[in-house]
Amino acid sequence: MRMKKALAILTAVCTVTASMCFATVAQAADKTDLVIALDADIDTLHATNYSTGVEQDVLNQIYDTLMYYNPDGKHDPEPRIAESYEISEDGLDYTFHLRDDVKFHDGATVTADDVVFSLELFKQSEYQGSQISMLSSVEATDDSTVVCHLDTPYAPFLQGVLTPYICEKAYYEKDEDAFATNPVGTGPYKFVSRATGSNITLEANEDYYRGAPEIKNLTFEVIPDVATKAIALQTGEVNFAEVDSSVLPQLQANPQIKIAEVETSGFAYVSM
């Protein structure tokens, strides 16, 4: 499982097991453009069939989820597109009440049918579906209420619904190819363009239900090489990057660059 990566100017830091180093370049307070280095190119922007962390880094800005981790240090799941939720006494039914002010980037309002569609599509995903495998069925009881049914109680279920992006059912059904290459979400940034092997460009969603982002233009530059990425930070070509420990001394020597060590969550395993 990979949680939303910390972009201090965009979102909050998630914590737990492994340390990672990030470098940021000092910027003018009124700067409205941000360039972030990616370690590798993406293969898709499909909301459920992605398989890499860099894809999720981009998708996190385009889409939102029902719930998210509270960044106050406790990291408890809290509502996002969902306004509130209840859990039945037997732990088998989770009822989510949706906000009424969430719109997709094309102007369509998010409905319970979109949420049902998104959870069902996510569960079918070869790459992501295991995160909500405990979900037996899901239904919309009205336009703003979704009920998830489990066969057996599963206490971490709320953590499971932190990951599925909420997608527009009508957009997917209209053009599944565009769904994977020209995504339409509800997040703080809208997809603009992609140059394969080079960059992905996003622009601020001025109608974002949580408030328009201060950063208006967000670009992800594909820079796999560690040394090249370090040079790009020093020249100001990029403003934010995950950096390797081998280049830390040269970056720390630059007063315009700030290094932050943060905690991130993940699973590591050995295949036998």
Regions found by a protein language model. Name each.
Residues 31-40, 83, 93-96, 115-118, ...:
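Short, well-ordered beta-strand elements
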Residues 132, 250-261:
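Ligand-binding "clamshell"
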Residues 205-251, 265:
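Ligand-site clamp/hinge motif
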Residues 37-89, 120, 184:
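N-terminal lobe/hinge region of extracytoplasmic solute-binding protein
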Residues 20-30:
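Sec-dependent signal peptide cleavage junction
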Residues 83-126, 141, 147:
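Aromatic- and charge-enriched surface segment that lines or borders ligand/interaction sites
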Residues 70-72, 162-213, 217:
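Gly/Pro-rich hinge or "lid" segments in bacterial periplasmic/extracellular proteins
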Residues 90, 130-171:
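Surface-exposed binding/hinge segments that line
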